[in-house]
């Protein structure tokens, strides 16, 4: 257990990320403002009221303890961002999940700190050749000591998991770690739970929803040293994963396909933009021999040290200006901070107050937008 990270702070961390309208960006902002999850929890109801909410309750201690005990009953555990075995590459993400629920083989989980992690993603409606290639490539990469990560979707994801079951595989889930989706992959889910590892940042029992898949995709990209895309349409979740990988400085690989197959237009587009072409396992291995692999960060991008406190009046002014500057179109948080003549503590506090009150929301990334019910303060 890391120093200065007690069981009480772990439960507070779980409660904070499970509280209403507290996403990963808001979680890390709260840590910067208050230093610990416990202090942030104490401040949250007041922040919601100042943001315009008439009622706000944080996740209760009983609810967090119930989820904790249920995960242990299932044979799993929570991984917290300060834990030594928290996946190394995730530590460098500004929007990394602070808590991951895990189920599966303890040895496979330990592999995240000792093996090179590669993601393989692709089309759900993949061709037979694409599926066979995914399974074969995953198997060969596993023999070369790579740990294979994917999203347990039908098609390419499922075959990548099947190919790497014997050598080490990890499924990142869009719903709770106890929820099998799609149902047709129930047997594969059970096999991974026995031989590999299942990870999710979502609460137990959370059913997958369309809005949760991009969040899942960012974890797939962030947890890996590189992403291999096999068959992907121009508008697909696989390309979302690739875009996150580019943002995080990961290597991008793509398998070429027929120009007449819509399932290959996304991968061919990645190749045009400079992705490494993959026809066999040697193409992947040689790429890491030629290029320096990104170094996994062992420190967090923004340390959880409290920022300088500012007056309520200054925060109110920042909140009012923020409501006038934002719209339904997403705005980069960095651009918003730069446009406002207030200390960063005031701007960050205003951001949290408005989000937990339901007036603004974050996209999967570093953008915010105004919700329909938002109002301007008088």
Predicted regions and their residues:
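Glycine-biased, small-residue-rich flexible motifs in mid-sequence functional cores and linkers
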Residues: 1-7, 80-378
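Short, small/acidic-rich helices and loops at N termini and domain boundaries
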Residues: 1-85, 357-366, 370-378
């Amino acid at each position: 257990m890391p120093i200065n990270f007690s069981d009480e702070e772990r439960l507070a961390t779980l409660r904070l990320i499970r509280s209403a309208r507290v996403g990963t960006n808001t979680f890390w902002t709260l840590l910067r403002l208050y230093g610990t999850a416990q202090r942030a929890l104490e401040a949250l109801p007041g922040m919601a009221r100042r943001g315009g909410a008439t009622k706000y309750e944080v996740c209760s201690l009983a609810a967090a303890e119930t989820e904790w005990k249920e995960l242990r009953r299932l044979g799993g555990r929570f991984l917290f961002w300060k834990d030594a075995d928290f996946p190394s590459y995730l530590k460098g993400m500004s929007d990394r999940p602070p808590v991951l629920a895990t189920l599966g083989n303890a040895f496979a989980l330990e592999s995240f700190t000792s093996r090179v992690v590669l993601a393989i993603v692709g089309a759900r409606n993949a061709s037979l050749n694409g599926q066979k290639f995914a399974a074969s490539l995953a198997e060969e990469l596993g023999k070369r000591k790579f740990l294979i990560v994917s999203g347990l979707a039908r098609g390419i994801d499922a075959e990548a998991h099947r190919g790497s079951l014997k050598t080490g595989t990890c499924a990142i889930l869009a719903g709770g770690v106890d929820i099998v989706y799609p149902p047709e992959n129930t047997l594969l889910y059970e096999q991974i739970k026995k031989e590999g590892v299942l990870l999710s940042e979502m609460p137990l029992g959370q059913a997958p929803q369309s809005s949760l898949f991009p969040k899942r995709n960012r974890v797939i990209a962030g947890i890996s040293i590189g992403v291999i895309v096999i068959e992907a349409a121009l508008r697909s979740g696989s390309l979302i994963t690739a875009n996150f990988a580019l943002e995080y400085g990961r290597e991008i690989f793509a398998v070429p396909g027929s120009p007449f197959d819509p399932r290959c237009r996304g991968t061919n587009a990645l190749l045009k933009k400079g992705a490494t072409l993959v026809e066999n396992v040697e193409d992947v291995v040689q790429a890491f021999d030629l290029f320096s692999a990104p170094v996994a960060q062992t420190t967090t991008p923004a340390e959880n040290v409290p920022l300088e406190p500012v007056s309520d009046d200054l925060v109110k002014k920042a909140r009012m200006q923020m409501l006038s500057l934002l719209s339904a179109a997403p705005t980069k948080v960095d651009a918003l901070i730069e446009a406002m003549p207030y200390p960063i503590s005031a701007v960050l506090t205003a951001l949290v107050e408005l989000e937990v009150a339901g007036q603004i929301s974050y996209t999967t990334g570093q953008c915010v937008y105004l919700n329909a019910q938002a109002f301007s303060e008088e």
